Design a protein with these regions (language model features):
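Core RecA-like ATPase module of SF1/SF2 helicases and allied nucleic-acid translocases
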Residues: 2-236
Length: 237
């Protein structure tokens, strides 16, 4: 469950990594809601070109636009800098810097520098909604999303046309804040499509009545995530 994953994540952060801050440099995260970004524009000051690349993560195709720039000096080495235009539910990210923690609309946000290891370590500066980190739901609940939407919409009520108001909401940095959870421990559902060398598996509380075909399917999915070693945690003898 998400609740149990939260317990393991906090235990790993506090007792193994010695981290007490809510979010800090080096934290491993997992994106829990798709996020679309505007396509990048090449810098006019550099001799650059844009080309597209795709990556398939957990069955979802993520679009990354790579900006290839040439250093101004003749014969300089080309630098390829991936720029993500779509961040998928399930993508991994590593925190490089956290700043400007603030509260708006009853939610807490932070500006975070993130590195995405699945995309050649592309780096992005993003606004992250901190409330999603420890929620017991897979991401913000429908009620929370609706609350945020209504509060943001109020800021644009002076715009007469509804279509224009909605466009502003869709572009708003707080409404579009990236939703992430810690990625040290994740649910079996979230792990679908991925594999790791070593897996520590905790099935949680179980009774004989829970031994259904759905449980067998869950068990198969969980066991096949490991490519080398599978460790059973808190498993009944």
């Amino acid at each position: 469950s998400n609740k149990r994953a939260n317990v393991f994540n906090q235990g790993i952060r506090n007792m193994v990594l010695g981290r007490e801050e809510e979010l800090t440099t080096g934290d491993m995260l997992m994106v829990v809601k798709n996020k679309y970004k505007n396509s990048p524009t090449p810098s006019p000051s550099l001799n650059g070109s844009l080309n597209n690349a795709t990556n398939n993560v957990n069955g979802l195709t993520t679009q990354a636009t790579r900006q290839v720039t040439q250093l101004p000096s003749g014969g300089g080495k080309e630098i390829e800098k991936p720029i993500l235009t779509f961040i998928a539910n399930g993508d991994r990210a590593v925190v490089r810097r956290v700043r400007n923690v603030r509260e708006f609309y009853g939610f807490r946000f932070a500006d975070v520098s993130l590195e995405f290891p699945d995309y050649n370590n592309a780096e992005e500066e993003m606004t992250v909604i901190l409330d999603a980190l420890m929620t017991e739901a897979p991401a913000l609940t429908q009620e929370q999303n609706e609350q945020l939407f209504q509060h943001v919409l109020e800021d644009y009520e002076d715009i007469p046309l509804k279509a224009d108001r909605m466009k502003k909401v869709r572009e708003d940095e707080y409404y579009n804040a990236l939703q992430v959870k810690f990625g040290y421990a994740i649910t079996c559902h979230k792990a679908q499509g991925g594999q790791w060398a070593h897996i520590y598996l905790d099935q949680g509380y179980m009774t004989d009545e829970m031994l259904t075909p759905d449980y067998i399917h869950w068990l198969y999915t969980a066991f096949t995530r490991a490519t080398e070693h599978l460790y059973l945690v808190n498993w009944p003898k």
